[in-house]
């Protein structure tokens, strides 16, 4: 790793972690769910039904940890569990209307906060962020 990459990595890490914490504080009080639980709901919202194993892999956690998260979300009425269509041993997780509403409300609240902050930036700064967003997504998926 070059010195320039190390400095960039440190700066990005600090900025991304601070922004993550700030966005985490903008949760919907009606749906007081952990960041991990909201990530699971968001994944189901984007991708549709998934198995516990697929969710665990996607969130980079162990299946037993995902099973605990799914148990809480099921008890809260945010998701349903059903046997797989082709393999009845598989458990498929799907969003309920309550889960979908939680995702939508959470995104609206966080997007509103972020949109307000973006309004304080110059056009040039917003253009830089617009260009950086897909690159940051690529880093997150690596």
Q: Where are the model-predicted features located?
A:
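Amphipathic alpha-helical dimerization/coiled-coil segments
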Residues: 7, 23-26, 31, 108-142
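N-terminal helix-turn-helix DNA-binding core of bacterial DNA-binding proteins
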Residues: 23-65, 76-78
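Charged, amphipathic alpha-helical coiled-coil/dimerization segments
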Residues: 71-131
């Amino acid at each position: 790793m070059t010195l320039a990459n190390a400095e960039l990595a440190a700066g990005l890490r600090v900025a991304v972690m601070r922004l993550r914490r700030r966005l985490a504080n903008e949760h919907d009080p009606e749906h007081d769910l952990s960041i991990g639980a909201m990530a699971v709901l968001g994944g189901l919202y984007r991708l549709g039904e998934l198995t516990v194993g697929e969710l665990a892999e996607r969130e980079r956690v162990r299946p037993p940890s995902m099973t605990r998260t799914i148990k809480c979300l099921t008890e809260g009425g945010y998701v349903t569990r059903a046997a797989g269509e082709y393999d009845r041993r598989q458990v498929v997780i799907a969003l309920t209307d309550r889960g979908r509403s939680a995702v939508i409300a959470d995104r609206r609240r966080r997007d509103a906060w972020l949109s307000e902050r973006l309004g304080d930036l110059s056009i040039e700064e917003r253009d830089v962020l617009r260009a950086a967003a897909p690159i940051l997504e690529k880093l997150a998926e690596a």
